[in-house]
Amino acid sequence: MQESLVLEMLQTGKTATWPANSGTQDGEGFVDKEVKGVPSTDRTKRMKERFMNAKCKMDMEAPIAYTKAWRMYEGKPLYVRRGLSYKYMLEHLTPVIRPDELITMSKTRYDRGATQVPQFATDFMISFLTQAEDQKDEAKLFSVEGKDEAHTVDEEGWTPVGQLFSIREEEVKPMLEVLEYWKTRCVENVSDEWMKTSFPMYQDYINAKKVGLFPGSGLHAGCDGRWIPAYDVVLGGLNKVIDECKKNIAKTVVTTKDVADKVFFWQGCIYACEGAIAWANNYAKEARRLAEITPEPRKTELLQMAERLERVPAEPPRNFMEAVQALWTAQILIISDSLALGVSPGRWGKLLEPYYEKDLADGVITKEQALEVMEMLRIKFSTEEYITPSLWAAMASSNSFMNLAVGGLDPKTGQCTDNELEDLILQAGINMPTPQPTLSMLLSNKTSDHLALKAAECTKAGNGYPAWFNYDMMVEHNLWCYADEGITMEDARNCALSGCVENGLAGTGHPIAHPAFYNEGKTIELALHEGVDPRTGIKVMDGIKPVESYEDVWNNFVKIREHFMRVYMRYWNEVVACQRDIHPKIMGSIFMHDCVENGRPVDNLGCRYNGSVTLLDSGTVNVVNGLAAMKKLIWEDHKYTYAEFKEAMDNNFGFVLGAEKGNFSMLNQEIDPEKHMKYAQIHRDILNCPKFGNDDDFVDDIFVKVWQDYDRVTGSETTYNGYRWITAALSISAHGPHGRVTGATPDGRLAGVTLCDGILSASPGTDVNGPIALIRSGVKLDPTTFASVQLNMKFHPSAIRGEEGSKNFVDFIRSYFNMGGYHVQFNIVDSKMLRDAQDKPQNYRDLMVRVAGFSAYWNELGKPIQDEVIARTEYDAL
């Protein structure tokens, strides 16, 4: 390793660069982005300005209406009650048409709005609304230090709720009444009460949450979603779904409870579709009302909007604008029915392309008008926020992880079908940098250079998207994952990203309904302390022996990890059993192929393919580097004893504990003058040990072994659907809060500091041999059995500047994928700009960066995550 580079980063905040002698960081200023975009019309400029000035607000209209209906329909069969309650809720939501928009409908009344789904979890929201003491410690530990003006509502009549939102004061009391009703009926508390007596591993689960192996309070508040709906259903019209359900009921003779449930499900679907159509008609009425009091040209726009809403989603769209409105309506319907994070549009460019081409040929629309619509959609997606407990806020701001993909191949023919509308989607991403939807490029060996270079241009805009995915490997994974279910090649090809970086089948695959992020850093800490957590004093597991050899370290680590991975997977199976009886998906099932035909919701084996449930992970590279350091320094070089190594680690390598100062950043950690000299040399030696990401088999072999063991455990457990669990190697940004509860680790990371961000991302500042070495390390692990892997890279803008730079950039990615790589995403930014943005946030309101599986506004990230992005090695050359 480059001598003491990481130590220098800790003490000075310097960003590592490659090549190490590059001069790009030495100048006074910073290098700006090569590609810049602005909204293409005055209309979208105004829409962006309103969005950027909007405050994050809670809207309780939906849960209050839904709960009123739920109580009103008590005694009805579950699916019928769900459909009726959802219908009532939609019929009673206030239609809000925002200035300038041509595509309308939203989940809340606000430009940046979130609602709450108390059917899943209530306790954290009750604590927020009552300012309860039990939330204060967690809020302090998981504070979002970077909270900016978007999260501060200074209007009269509003009160803070959680760290990021505010709520109308008059809604607090009725919402608390709703929450009290659901408190003993929600998924979180019903499953918890049940498992206290029925789940043998219950206490292990509780202890694991307390020490930080799993997320803490409000785990169930983000437990739904991550799928790609069958949006083609709405292109056929919801009246068609109603007719299908009625025909199914008419020809069904009820003989068993299972058959009766099918009939109840179809009835629930009918009610849900009727509610959706009524909601669209309410918007149409509002558009006509506004048209009566609005001058031209907006008057005509509102009348045209009304015509579209009177057509879709009830009937098939006839043109491009109706098709876009239909798809957006479907999106809002699904995310209004449930928590539904990561409900991803998939390849909308392919679905909309026939409408676009026809209208373009007929002179109904121009390319410029279509681009404006794509820019509008970015605003529409970004208005939809969600609220979570403090831990989740620290992880992901209020991002909903919706993913729009371009590229890939035609599912039927396997041929390249890149189209002009996908170019416009990418251009809209350049012109309108918003966190939602994130963009993904599905790169196949058959993908045209034209689309790949357009995606490169979008990447060079520096907003962290598109992420790049090996489409051919995605198809290979699908053929493996769903082989037992007889997947066809057409369905295997019909895939995109469900949420951040997870491979998902479009319209046929079961949602990945859970939010677990396993903390690898905490596991190695427990392995070195005989199963006792130093922070809490809790002993999570017996039989963890004192360390006398490297084999003891390894055995302790895998023993603890295997046990608690199984604890979580089995726990979640029982949670979903409760969810099926409390809040089965109705609208989500309508937009999933075969559910209506089968008479079963997506939660209960209604999908065509159901083997897609995954377990997530963070901090693995910290463990790998730590194992390598211990193996080398203690048992190979014999430079230190295990006792000396552990003593240094337990004393935070001579640095002040971050928790004492509230400083969890990996940059600018404070030296403890009484201890530092004693542990400085061992810390330096640890930091200079072999690190993953440098094409060094000594550490890379450990990396592969660690992940193969993880994959072994997930694959040996059975999901609530009766299929094996699947490994998903991503962290979103769980590495932030997981790091805060984890002490110093044997890789030299300090206590409380952010863990490594993904599976393949090197620990910041340690990948000193360049980008080729990093990807060569990564491809030593075969990801075919993984639903996702995650590799973050950061390039200085000068590294890929110009047309030649773009070509080299695409060649680099193609080479990586040909070597067996699955995913890579980039920040193309000068770290000096990021530091300037920390100092002068008012100048960077719309600056975005890639965090993990999503992009976020820089000013809305906590400082530890900001510093982790800054600390990532910045490549000055390919």
From Swiss-Prot:
Keywords: Lyase, Organic radical, Repeat, Transferase
EC number: 4.1.1.115
Sequence ranges assigned to domain Glycine radical in this UniProt record: 758-878
Residues with Glycine radical modification: 853
GO CC annotation: cytosol
Post-translational modification: Requires the activating protein OsIADAE to generate the key active site glycyl radical on Gly-853 that is involved in catalysis.
Active-site residues, as the UniProt record annotates them: 500 (cysteine radical intermediate), 502 (proton acceptor)
Top EC class of this enzyme: lyase
Reaction(s) catalysed by this chain's protein: (indol-3-yl)acetate + H(+) = skatole + CO2
GO molecular-function terms, A-Z: lyase activity; transferase activity
Ranges that cross the membrane: none
Function: Glycyl radical enzyme that catalyzes the terminal step of tryptophan fermentation, the decarboxylation of indoleacetate to form skatole, a malodorous compound that contributes to the characteristic smell of animal feces. No activity is detected with phenylacetate or p-hydroxyphenylacetate as substrates, indicating high substrate specificity.
Family: Belongs to the glycyl radical enzyme (GRE) family.
Pathway involvement of the protein, from the record: Amino-acid degradation
Name this protein carries in UniProt: Indoleacetate decarboxylase
UniProt keyword Iron-sulfur, yes or no: no
Keyword check for Repeat: yes
Domain (PFL) ranges: 42-750
InterPro entries: Gly_radical, GRE, IAD-like, PFL_dom
Pfam families cross-referenced by the UniProt entry: Gly_radical (PF01228), PFL-like (PF02901)
Subunit: Homodimer (predominantly) and monomer.
Gene3D superfamilies membership: 3.20.70.20
